[in-house]
Amino acid sequence: MVNLLDFIARIFISSLFLLSAYNKVLSYSGTENWMEGFGVPGFVLGQTIFLEIILPLFIILGYQTRLASIILALFSIATAIIFHQDFTNQIQIIAFFKNIGLAGGFLFLAINGPKDWAIDKKKKYVRL
């Protein structure tokens, strides 16, 4: 049961990023303009989409889970600080703390790692 819940949790925490990447692809130029409005160069969008697809898939599959989790935790914190700093707007406050909460979840995953249903757990290391 623990393995199933761990796997479901990895899907849940990753799904937001997969959906976000999908939306960025559908509205590429609009997202690029929006990012540039916050001082983020538009050329970063391609790398952002790549990260929002690859790293969540790594987490779901349990491959390099700790590293992917640390990167997404840092990404979530950076996103909160850059894009959700208008604390006069209730929606922006919620979005800020959503990203901070996601970072906390990713750090928890980085500390504890995935359970048995993960590629990382299937690896066999040989000490020489």
Regions from the language model: what does each represent?
Residues 1-26, 33, 42-50, 54, ...:
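Extended, low-polarity transmembrane helix blocks
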